Regions:
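Short intrinsically disordered terminal tails
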Residues: 1-2, 187
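Phosphate-binding/catalytic loops
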Residues: 149-171
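Short, conserved alpha-helical segments within structured domains
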Residues: 116-120, 143, 170-173
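Active-site catalytic microenvironments for nucleophilic, acid-base chemistry
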Residues: 127-131, 180-187
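Acidic, divalent-metal-coordinating active-site segment for phosphoryl/phosphodiester hydrolysis
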Residues: 169-182
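Conserved beta-strand -> loop -> alpha-helix junction used to position metal-binding or nucleic-acid-contacting
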Residues: 134-152
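Conserved non-catalytic scaffold segment of RNase H-like nuclease domains
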Residues: 3-129, 133, 138, 156, ...
């Protein structure tokens, strides 16, 4: 799988130049209609099924916020989200039912940003394949941007992952990631 890193590393850039490139990217990402920030919750880290997805714009407009029926029982041992019950997820739409909405909010040339874009990308593509659906432009790794990588670059530690504080929902994750993006752009 392609590694989703932004800005791309340049060996001939100093740490200060790399930081400023990251600040410029964050400022562009916060322009109206430039970026949709995606937040996801899964049943397990890395390989879990999608159970919640949200998407917001830089002005905090909520474009998507829904639970997702994983169509499989949640293993109580790996349950990460005690506030979500089987009954809540059973009545939620499936990924196949929300894919069109996700495609719509991320279309028209916008960048797709997620805190951990590599994980978000893998989850969205994996869910699309499991549903037998075409992820269209979501399958292009060049459209995705990692706010975590931008944060690491900005802090001068491009090889270190700084996690977000725990959040209660995919929407909360979007807002936390947006806050990081705003911090970077304010530099």
């Amino acid at each position: 799988m392609t590694t989703l890193v932004y800005p791309p590393p340049h060996e001939n850039m100093t740490a200060g130049e790399h930081r400023q490139a990251t600040v410029r990217w964050a400022r562009r990402a916060l322009r109206p209609d430039a970026t949709v920030i995606i937040g996801l919750e899964t049943t397990a880290p890395g390989s879990g099924s999608l159970i919640e997805i949200a998407g917001i714009e830089a002005d905090r407009t909520i474009r998507l916020n829904t639970l997702v029926n994983p169509k499989t029982p949640i293993n109580p041992v790996t349950r990460r989200h005690p506030h979500l019950t089987e009954d809540m997820l059973t009545g939620a739409p499936t990924f196949g039912q929300i894919l069109t909405e996700l495609l719509t909010i991320t279309d028209d040339g916008r960048s797709i940003a997620a805190y951990n874009s590599g994980s978000a990308f893998a989850t969205v593509i994996g869910e699309s394949r499991r549903a037998g659906l075409d992820p269209e432009h979501l399958e292009d790794p060049a459209a995705w941007r990692s706010i975590a990588q931008a944060r690491s670059n900005w802090l001068g530690h491009p090889d270190h992952y700084f996690p977000l504080p725990p959040t209660a929902s995919a929407l909360d994750q979007c807002h936390a990631a947006l806050s990081v993006l705003r911090d970077i752009s304010a530099d």
